[in-house]
Amino acid sequence: ECGAPDNSMAALEYAMSLGCYGMECDIYWTKDNDIIVAHANGDCKVNNLQPWTATVAELRAAGRLSNGEELPTLEEFIRRVMVEGNCTRLVLDVKRVDKPYAQPEYVINAARRACEIVTEMKAKHFVELICTGFNLDAMKAAHNCAVIAEVPIGMNSSRSGKEYGTLGFGWANLSAASGMDAAAGGKGSCSLEEYEKAGVALSVYNVDQRAGDGNAVYSTAAVNYYIANYKRFRTLCSNYPKWLIGKIDHAYKVYDGIRSEADFEAFAESLASDPTGRRFLDGNGEVVLHCDLTLNGFVPLSNFSGTFNGNGKTLTIGYRGDAQQIGLFKRLSGTARNLTV
């Protein structure tokens, strides 16, 4: 969204400027027992090197990020978020190591060393962990490290809610596209209700504005599902955080009646999911029109079941079309009064 490379300091600064809950950071253990924050390729390589075979200096010498930044370490990222007034956490994604073959010991090393650094820097309130679920030993080891460091930990796996509870994990992190079910716009079999029933908090990645990420959903129906249910999720991850925050703010904003054409448009949009228009109600339970408005390109509103108090004002509507569609509401099962149209 901001054009910064993944896992860059610029991306972190952007997330912090928006007041995001957190930024996901991919982490790997290095040969010199440090942790780099980097997005590896399909061969688990960063700058054409597998991180666990190289030192931080060697990885940095092999190349920079596309914006010219030096490859960052976890310590540098922690130092940046531990500042007065910042609310953005680092959500450390302990990446699987499966190239050229599965090597869970390096996943365990990454979880262990990351938690040690967090403890050394007294940063437990600024960091959370997500561990890959591909290897049971790595998963259990990461969980133990996180518990000792007092850092929240989730698992990235489409296991059932019941399995999460059995393994001691209270937080699941799933792909929106392949993990979540059709009701959420995905192709998987996991549902929000299943995890709620099991007492497991649920995060998903990603809810996006457009196609481009294989784990993302971006259809209007899917986006609307997550917006309608976002308070039931632990976190929603997105490659377009400013866009998603704006969508959520718009959907949950509480209005003082209708005072502008923009307010009226928001009211009309809200009726699709809430025919009472509750976000626009005053203390008497009415939607009050506070000024005369001229509406162009008007489409009759969805079913309205509340009370629309025109407050003696006038709606002037520019309309051309089927005479059967003329009217303020397609269906009115409530009351409209004190209004001139």
Predicted regions located by residue number:
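Phosphate-group recognition and catalysis centered on beta-loop-alpha active-site segments
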Residues: 1-253
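Surface-exposed repetitive/solenoidal architectures
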Residues: 250-341
